[in-house]
Amino acid sequence: MANRRMFSLDVVDTDRFLEMPLTAQCLYFHLGMRADDDGFIDSPKRILRYIGSNDDDLRILLTKGYLIPFEDGVIVIKDWL
């Protein structure tokens, strides 16, 4: 896993993103920092616990389309590149 990550202002500097609770925004950044080089996170619940977030924040990111879930619990960040 790389040690440097970049986040696009086209994603995080929008009303749609900024209207989310700060806890959901924080989760998005932490997931991005821990994603593999293709944007996949194999243990999102571990990261939730690690930063003191909750399932509602994850649900918000999924509902708004920032994350794509897989049946095995893995998620991918949609706007990864």
Where are these regions (language model features)?
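Detector for short helical micro-motifs
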Residues: 2-81
